[in-house]
């Protein structure tokens, strides 16, 4: 079972990798490493959440924003590596 299949089993779908929101590259592959730029909670190019947790956003909104960012990172890694199955390890 592929990593993408496991994600689908959890009810998660990888989005299309987001385009950079500025003058930078979203990822850079160097040898066997892939460096990914910081992420915003973008859904189909639109910023889904704006504000601070506790002031403008609830804790649940924060969890959802983090989930969107994580899925965006995974989609970028899948695009760069050809498949998430080609990723051996994530490093913070």
Where are the model-predicted features located?
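Short, polar/acidic, helix-capping and beta-turn segments at strand->helix junctions
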Residues: 1-92
């Amino acid at each position: 079972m592929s990593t993408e299949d496991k994600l689908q089993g959890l009810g998660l779908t990888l989005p299309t990798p987001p385009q950079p929101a500025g003058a930078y590259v979203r990822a850079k592959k160097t040898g066997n490493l892939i460096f990914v730029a910081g992420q915003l909670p973008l859904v189909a190019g639109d910023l889904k959440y704006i504000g601070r947790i506790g002031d403008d956003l609830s804790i649940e909104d924060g969890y959802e924003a983090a989930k969107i960012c994580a899925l965006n990172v995974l989609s970028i890694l899948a695009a760069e590596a050809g498949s998430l199955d080609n990723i051996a390890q994530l490093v913070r």
